């Protein structure tokens, strides 16, 4: 073996062992072998590549393995080690080194070494290795299980809203709630239409054949895939049948037999790629691989066949269940090209991880790492370049052909070479199958219908366009007949008469013989892995996530320590006495505060659980594990942290405050605090499971706390709770915790050995008197009753959480919408099929008609790229010269010379031994972009395309930039550059609640100046310009459609791309950067977007686009190409030429570069011939070659020319930084905020509903309490009610505003970077927008509470109650906004905000009256906003009442005297309280504005 390696064959694609011939070499070993020769002398003969000594060594090892018991034999394999071979070679030994290994304990190094040797070039070595696996199986005559999926007369229908009724306004949402409530009792008001998604389709997906699913948008591809995988939403109506090997879906477990790979990537962001795949592999198990291996080994032993070591090791290693990290994972990582990022976290919105294309591959790998052989794959190539897509599909094709798997895959823009990998094609359009059968006959079918695919047109692109009414005519090829539109239904009928259709019909007419189905083909058990293994995997994953989220737990503990220290010093034992009832009530306040802090401590579980739910729901639907397997580790692994936090709290507070000194009472309180924490964690987990959405869960959690808090027995004693609410007292967990804590404390000797006189003058033990006065149970057994109650609630909440995970589905599914016009047309012609785009609907009716056709520039006829004319023909029936646009602009060029970009070296790379301080991402990039020239910026993933664009556009927020950048010869100044440039980001970031036209008007009004040259730019001219831009980008018929959230409501992906372009165009820029404008689009949508781009260029603007996997049409629509290689180096910069000829000539001139094949996509060919593997093969560096070329010298000359200003020109200059004045910016921002708030029911309706519920709850619980002022306890109850209402409504306002501000802040970063406005007008507009909504909220809250509690109806008192409540709600809302502004996201903001809730509570004056707060903490009382609120509410209502009340242990007093001396509230202080409340609101709003201006958490 070592001779092979030493002879220069290191580039050989794998290492294999031959089976049969004497003295095989490496190349011969990879040759395909006949699969029929089972056993015989041929199988027994062995030869070594290193001679007989090697063969003898291997034979001895194998003989030793054969003597082992069956179980051990299945776990033991022979491994040849490269390191040991090298050592032997150095020592002069002439034989190969082997060792026996336990495949369950293969080390990381051993696995990696094996993969490196066997799969050096993934797609090529994969085929060879799989061929050897297959040969081994065939040699002993084992038949692999196969699955044929058939569907007959499959029909799927949905019910959906019509027209504007679907828009998410406050009014529509209220109607939806009302209709849902009526629907529960059988009444179904409202207009809904039936949408037929699939119309009686029939077909078959066969094993060993790769099947491609094609179709235009909304044709039903995803629905078909879901239906075949048995994963259709239960709310959909389904007809027809789907069978696997003749078995219907109900007869076996479809989720285990087949896997649906979604087009959305849902993963745990904190886990690495390898950990994600390992967990998936452990949950899916190995299926029947072990049984197959056992039978294989038995037959080989009988036949005397000795398998190849590598093949044997691989099969054994991938057949072992319960391995933490499997060789199957390493294999999957390699064939998907994920091995380079295996140890990188996947990432999410909170943390940077792998790229979007890599995430897409992880989604695929998560399923193929398991034993499932039936795969339904939905658009798995989004975000991938064409060469990566080709590699992945090629590997999957090999698995299908050699492993007899069944795969149906939909792709958006498959390149011709990828298309050629498929055996069968299913073409779906308008819910009907137009063609299904061999790929070779698909063009023949359409030619029989009169349509022909053009020469330089990809077949897949042709197939997706030929059924479209807009695009069909250009493909008409029958010159003997005039063109007429052929409908989808007619195509479908013609296919049934086509020879392929007839064969399919014959195939389906013969039922599948169930007896032919392999017993291992289908899975009949929901659980394929043992419970023990699932628990091990789940515990390991949960522990890993806890370690990765350790910051949260450390932060929580530190926060708890701080609050404990504050509480200890507030209730310091030197200030705490046990003399009378007043002293006792202070202790009750300390116990109550302890209870509430530890209850609130569980709030973090809410957001942590919500973020995990999407991944859980995905795993649940795939039957990875039952729900309790997810919840058990979740609960158990939190217990140690809860114990630590409980110990910390009790140790810090117990003796410092001065609770009962007995040791047993210390440990009893510790137990109770622990149980309270466990109960709180269970409560918030259950809330998260029931609500399933962050905003709703925040409100639901606050609602649960409110009910438990109010009915816990401490705000309102049991005797005072109305009988209609008494049930709430018994189901409040806080009641059990409160009573248990109090009994534990007040039964101590220091309370029981002292006596006080009751109202009748009879002596009573102080502890008993205290408990009776506070309505606490006086039975000492209540400690254990309370502890048992808390334990019971803990178990109940966790069971409820588990049940919610079992039975509830995730929220926020896309809602199909039918426009008014489409519905009327369907009613008129009786067509049940409606064309649907999720949520793309006009607010005043239908807008689903295709976009109006565009005038084309006369410049097109002279274009050098013939791809342009074909591109423009898509969807266009008219053409003519474009008139000039209403606003002039100055064409500008951009040149850049030797641009370098560095970032600080990542810590992970430094840990791996990298010594440099900086990582270089761009290296000596030189080039230019010119007016009326469309430039493509290309390169493989990670080449630095977006990085270069960000650097040139000035969008980088970090790193180090070097080089010379000039605009028309003058040095680039970012402030002025932002005014004349536009940047279309890949992610299409827009405010979701405004319409298309409103988005454009908003951008135009902020970015267009008052004057261009001598021309005044009036508002009417701006509106006219907006209309022209909408026409240019074909959005005029979508002008009244809501933008919406991607994938949920609003515009389709392609429409959002065009909106992104339009938003930049209305700024009238001279230079436009576009990042991936066609990513995630099908061929037709990409063509529409590119036509928009081309139209933009033809107005004379400078446009640059990064692009991933262009079709031939799209690629040749560009004029020039700037190509980067990995490392950010230029390898080509120049013209494409007609049919890309100039670019092709450049690369073909390089020695060793293969010629382009006929009809091959030039973009794909270019990426392939310039890849890293090609550089290794040619032993050259393309970047160095380019730098020595004539092309480079020409570009240098051009850059030097463009770096000199033309005579008579001047540098860009604007008198102000922004186009609009500060007032103008504020007006525009306020206008958009108004629209956003009105159309945000999930925010405003939720908080309004919560406020209404709180008001009614408090009103019914504290019914007419204002008239029952007989004693001090009644007054304390009223104060408690007021404090509770303001605190909970305030906290809910704070929590619900955070996600809204966070979403809008993302848009703000884009708009501010574009130079639309400064931060202050934006922030002030958002602050002002809250005022009317909070006013409405306060108005109905005040009326309800004031009336039901029967406070005194005087104008002054009512006004003061309203005033204090209004500004309290307002400052809480602004406090929430401020916490977002100082945090990277709303999850961190929620934790930060919660940290101060406890302090607000403690110093509110409710738990400990102001006169009793130690002097060293009194300063914080005056800084606590909640304290001023309670002060204002109490003193305005009761500060002037002279009614006599009884006070326990003291003489009777007036209410005003008691309020002044017990609580420290002075009536004369009211003129100070009012402005202070206003100041708190102003302060938080001001801090929000300052932080949003100064802090930037966007890392680019």
Swiss-Prot record:
GO cellular component, one term: membrane
Residues that coordinate or bind ATP 2: 939-946
One Pfam family hit: ABC2_membrane
Claim: Kinase is one of the keywords in the record: no
Membrane topology reported for the UniProt record: Multi-pass membrane protein
SUPFAM superfamilies: P-loop containing nucleoside triphosphate hydrolases (SSF52540)
Domain ABC transporter: 182-455, 894-1151
Transmembrane segments: 551-571, 584-604, 639-659, 670-690, 695-715, 724-744, 783-803, 1245-1265, 1277-1297, 1331-1351, 1358-1378, 1388-1408, 1416-1436, 1472-1492
Protein name from the UniProt record: ABC transporter G family member 42
Organism lineage string: Eukaryota, Viridiplantae, Streptophyta, Embryophyta, Tracheophyta
Gene field: ABCG42
């Amino acid at each position: 073996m070592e001779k092979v390696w030493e002879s220069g064959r290191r580039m050989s694609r794998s290492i294999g062992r031959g089976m049969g011939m004497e003295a095989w070499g490496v190349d011969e070993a990879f040759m395909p072998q006949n699969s029929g020769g089972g056993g015989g002398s041929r199988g027994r003969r062995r030869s070594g590549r290193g001679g007989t000594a090697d063969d003898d060594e291997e034979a001895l090892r194998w003989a030793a393995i054969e003597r082992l018991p069956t179980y051990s034999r299945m776990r033991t394999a022979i491994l040849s080690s490269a390191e040991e071979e090298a050592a032997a070679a150095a020592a002069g030994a002439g034989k190969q080194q082997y060792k026996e290994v336990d495949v369950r304990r293969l080390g990381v190094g051993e696995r990696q070494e094996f993969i490196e040797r066997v799969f050096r070039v993934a797609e090529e070595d994969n085929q060879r290795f799989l061929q050897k696996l297959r040969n081994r199986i065939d040699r002993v005559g084992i038949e692999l299980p196969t699955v044929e999926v058939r569907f007959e007369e499959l029909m799927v229908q949905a019910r959906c809203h019509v027209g504007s009724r679907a828009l998410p306004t406050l009014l529509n949402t209220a109607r939806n709630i009302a209709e849902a409530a009526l629907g529960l009792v059988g009444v179904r008001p409202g207009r809904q239409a039936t949408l037929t998604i699939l119309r009686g389709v029939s077909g078959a997906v066969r094993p060993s054949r790769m099947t491609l699913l094609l179709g235009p948008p909304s044709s039903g591809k995803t629905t078909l895939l879901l239906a075949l995988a048995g994963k259709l939403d239960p709310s959909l109506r389904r007809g027809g049948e789907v069978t696997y090997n003749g078995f219907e879906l109900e007869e076996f477990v479809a989720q285990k037999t087949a896997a649906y790979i979604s087009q959305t990537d849902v993963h745990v962001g904190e886990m690495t790629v390898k950990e994600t795949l390992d967990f998936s592999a452990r949950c899916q198990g190995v299926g029947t691989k072990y049984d197959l291996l056992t039978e294989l080994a038995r037959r080989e032993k009988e036949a005397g066949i000795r398998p190849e070591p590598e093949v044997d090791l691989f099969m054994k290693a991938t057949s072992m269940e319960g391995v933490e990290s499997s060789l199957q994972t390493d294999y999957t990582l390699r064939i998907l090209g994920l091995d380079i990022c295996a140890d990188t976290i996947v990432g999410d919105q909170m943390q940077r991880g792998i790229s979007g294309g890599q995430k897409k591959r992880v989604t695929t790998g998560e399923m193929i790492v398991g034993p499932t052989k039936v795969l339904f794959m939905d658009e798995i190539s989004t975000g991938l370049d064409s060469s990566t897509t080709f590699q992945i599909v090629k590997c999957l094709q090999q698995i299908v052909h050699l492993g007899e798997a069944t795969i149906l895959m939909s792709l958006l823009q498959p390149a011709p070479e990828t298309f050629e990998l498929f055996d069968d094609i299913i073409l779906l359009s308008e819910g009907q199958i137009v063609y299904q059968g061999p790929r070779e006959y698909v063009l023949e079918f359409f030619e029989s219908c009169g349509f022909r695919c053009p020469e330089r047109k990809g077949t897949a692109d042709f197939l997706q366009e030929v059924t479209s009414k807009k695009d069909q005519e250009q493909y008409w090829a029958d010159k003997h007949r005039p063109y007429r539109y052929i409908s989808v239904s007619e195509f479908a009928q013609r296919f049934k008469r086509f020879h392929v259709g007839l064969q399919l019909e014959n195939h389906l007419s013969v039922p599948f013989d169930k007896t032919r189905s392999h017993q291992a083909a289908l899975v009949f058990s929901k659980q394929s892995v043992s419970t023990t293994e699932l628990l091990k995997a789940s515990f390991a994953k949960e522990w890993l996530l806890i370690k990765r989220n350790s910051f949260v737990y450390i932060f929580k503990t530190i926060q708890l320590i701080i609050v404990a220290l504050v509480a200890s010093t507030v209730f310091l034992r030197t200030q705490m006495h046990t003399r009378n009832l007043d002293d006792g009530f202070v202790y009750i306040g300390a116990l109550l505060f302890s209870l509430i802090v530890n209850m609130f401590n569980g709030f973090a579980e809410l957001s942590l659980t919500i973020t995990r739910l999407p991944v859980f729901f995905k795993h649940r639907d795939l039957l990875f594990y039952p729900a309790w397997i997810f919840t058990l580790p979740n609960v158990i692994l939190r217990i140690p942290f809860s114990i630590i936090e409980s110990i910390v709290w009790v140790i810090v507070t117990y003796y410092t405050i001065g609770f009962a000194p007995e040791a047993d009472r210390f440990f009893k309180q510790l137990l109770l605090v622990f149980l309270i924490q466990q109960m709180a964690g269970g409560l918030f987990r259950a809330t998260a499971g029931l609500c399933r959405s962050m905003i709703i869960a925040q409100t639901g959690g606050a609602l649960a706390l409110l009910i438990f808090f109010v009915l816990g027995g401490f705000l309102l004693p049991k005797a005072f709770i109305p009988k209609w609410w008494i049930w709430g007292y018994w189901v409040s967990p806080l009641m059990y915790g409160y009573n248990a804590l109090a009994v534990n404390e007040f039964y101590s000797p220091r309370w029981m050995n002292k006596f006080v006189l009751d109202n009748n003058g009879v002596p009573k033990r102080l502890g008993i008197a205290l408990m009776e006065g506070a309505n606490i149970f006086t039975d000492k057994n209540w400690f254990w009753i309370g502890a048992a109650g808390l334990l019971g609630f803990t178990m109940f909440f966790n069971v409820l959480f588990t049940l919610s995970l079992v039975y509830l589905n995730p929220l926020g599914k896309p809602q199909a919408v039918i426009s008014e016009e489409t519905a009327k047309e369907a009613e008129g012609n009786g067509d049940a099929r409606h064309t649907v785009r999720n949520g793309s609907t006009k607010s005043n009716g239908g807008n689903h008609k295709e976009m109006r056709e565009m005038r084309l520039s006369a410049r097109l006829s002279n274009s050098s790229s013939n791809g342009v004319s074909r591109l423009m023909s898509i969807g266009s029936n008219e053409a003519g010269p474009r008139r000039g646009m209403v606003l002039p602009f100055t064409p500008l060029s951009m040149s850049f010379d030797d641009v370098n970009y560095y970032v600080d070296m990542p810590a992970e790379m430094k840990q791996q031994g990298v010594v440099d301080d900086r990582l270089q991402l761009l290296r000596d990039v030189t080039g230019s972009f010119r007016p009326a020239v469309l430039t493509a910026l290309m390169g493989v993933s990670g080449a630095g395309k977006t990085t270069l664009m960000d650097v040139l556009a000035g969008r980088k927020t970090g790193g180090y930039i070097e080089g010379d950048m000039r605009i028309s010869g003058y040095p680039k100044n970012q402030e002025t550059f932002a005014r004349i440039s536009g940047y279309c980001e890949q992610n299409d970031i827009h405010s979701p609640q405004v319409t298309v036209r409103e988005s454009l008007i908003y951008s135009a009004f902020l970015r267009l100046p008052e004057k261009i040259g001598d021309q005044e730019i009036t508002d009417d001219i701006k509106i006219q310009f907006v209309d022209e831009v909408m026409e240019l980008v074909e959005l005029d018929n979508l002008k009244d459609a809501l933008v919406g959230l991607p994938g949920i409501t609003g515009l389709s992906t392609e429409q959002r791309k065009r909106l992104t372009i339009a938003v930049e165009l209305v700024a009238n820029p001279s230079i436009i950067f576009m990042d991936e404008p066609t990513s995630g689009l099908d061929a037709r949508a990409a063509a529409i977007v590119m036509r928009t781009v081309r139209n933009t260029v033809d107005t004379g603007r400078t446009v640059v686009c990064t692009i991933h996997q262009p079709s031939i049409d799209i690629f040749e629509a560009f004029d020039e190409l700037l190509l980067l290689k990995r490392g950010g180096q230029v390898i080509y910069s120049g013209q494409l030429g007609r049919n890309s000829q100039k670019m092709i000539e450049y690369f073909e001139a390089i020695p060793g570069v293969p010629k382009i094949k006929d009809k091959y996509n030039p973009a794909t060919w270019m990426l392939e011939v310039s890849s890293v593997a090609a550089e290794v093969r040619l032993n050259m560096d393309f970047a160095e070659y380019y730098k020595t070329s004539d092309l480079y010298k020409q570009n240098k000359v051009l850059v030097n020319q463009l770096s000199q200003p033309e005579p008579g020109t001047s540098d860009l200059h604007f008198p102000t930084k922004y186009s609009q004045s500060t007032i103008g910016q504020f007006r525009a921002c306020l206008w958009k905020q108004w629209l956003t708030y009105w159309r945000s029911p999930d925010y405003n309706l939720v908080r309004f509903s919560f406020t209404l519920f709180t008001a009614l709850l408090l009103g019914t619980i504290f019914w007419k309490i204002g008239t029952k002022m007989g004693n001090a306890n009644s007054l304390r109850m009223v104060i408690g009610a007021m404090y509770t209402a303001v605190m909970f409504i305030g906290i809910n306002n704070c929590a619900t505003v955070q996600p809204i501000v966070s979403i809008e802040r993302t848009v703000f970063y884009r708009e501010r970077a574009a130079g639309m406005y400064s931060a202050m007008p934006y922030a002030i507009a958002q602050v002002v927008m809250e005022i009317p909504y909070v006013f409405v909220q306060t108005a109905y809250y005040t009326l309800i509470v004031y009336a039901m509690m029967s406070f005194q109806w005087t104008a002054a008192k009512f006004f003061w109650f309203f005033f204090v409540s209004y500004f309290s709600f307002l400052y809480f809302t602004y406090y929430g906004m401020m916490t977002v502004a100082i945090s990277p996201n709303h999850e961190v903001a929620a934790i930060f905000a919660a940290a101060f809730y406890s302090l607000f509570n403690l110093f509110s004056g409710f738990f400990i009256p102001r006169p009793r707060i130690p002097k060293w903490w009194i300063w914080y009382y005056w800084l606590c906003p909640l304290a001023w609120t309670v002060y204002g509410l109490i003193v305005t209502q009761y500060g002037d009442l002279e009614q006599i009340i009884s006070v326990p242990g003291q003489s009777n007093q007036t209410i005003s005297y008691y309020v002044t001396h017990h609580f420290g509230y002075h009536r004369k202080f009211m003129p100070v309280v009012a402005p202070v409340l206003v100041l708190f609101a102003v302060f938080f709003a001001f801090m929000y504005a300052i932080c949003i201006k100064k802090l930037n958490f966007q890392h680019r």
